[in-house]
């Protein structure tokens, strides 16, 4: 018997996704003035990545990028696309942003409770998506994505910075695989440091 429904792919445009991410971040009114200054500083640290992500996502308003701070622009782009790696989209960008700040989940709320704008790594980068989407969501990954990400546990004796770079590369490779090469991956100048 034939299915009664025709599957339809609904894709959220990148520029709208970035607006939604920015609107999902709620800065406490008492901290708003200070945060605007800090967000400007954080935004200045990622000029190259910001301009490349803006070009790829067709975002022409720099305020959109400032509004997603402390989320690195590339992490935001990957976050927007990551739900496609899950069998039924159990983990979405909004789940990541709004999940409670428990140590075992290590999503956005955990990050803002445990990191700050004056830390050595003040931005939530692509490698920091690993715990939420791989460690805690591995069972819901499609097999092709799991195959790529399962490469990481096989690696031994890596330094922490090497682990961060490998996690970022594997996440980007997995998302690129899922989307059939439609995600503009970072250039060589960026893969040496997942924060820039």
Predicted regions: what is each one?
Residues 37-40, 44, 147-150, 170:
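Polar/charged alpha-helical tracts
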Residues 194-196:
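Hydrophobic alpha-helical segments, chiefly the membrane-spanning helices
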Residues 150-188, 192:
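Terminal-proximal interaction/regulatory segments of ATP-powered molecular machines
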Residues 67, 71, 137, 157-165:
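Secondary-structure capping and boundary motifs in well-ordered enzyme cores
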């Amino acid at each position: 018997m034939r299915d009664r429904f025709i599957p339809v792919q609904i894709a959220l445009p990148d520029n709208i996704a970035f607006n939604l991410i920015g609107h999902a971040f709620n800065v406490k009114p008492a901290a708003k003035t200070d945060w605007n200054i800090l967000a400007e500083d954080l935004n200045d640290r990622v000029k190259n990545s910001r301009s490349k992500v803006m070009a790829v996502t067709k975002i022409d308003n720099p305020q959109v990028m400032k509004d997603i701070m402390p989320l690195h622009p590339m992490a935001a782009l990957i976050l927007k696309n990551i739900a496609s790696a899950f069998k039924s989209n159990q983990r979405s960008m909004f789940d990541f942003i709004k999940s409670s700040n428990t140590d075992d989940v290590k999503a956005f709320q955990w990050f803002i409770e445990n990191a700050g704008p004056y830390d050595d790594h003040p931005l939530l980068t692509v490698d920091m998506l690993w715990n939420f989407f791989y460690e805690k969501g591995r069972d819901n990954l499609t097999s092709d994505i799991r195959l790529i990400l399962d490469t990481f546990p096989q690696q031994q004796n890596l330094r922490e910075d090497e682990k961060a770079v490998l996690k970022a590369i594997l996440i980007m490779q997995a998302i690129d695989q899922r989307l059939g090469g439609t995600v503009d991956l970072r250039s060589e100048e960026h893969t040496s440091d997942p924060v820039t």
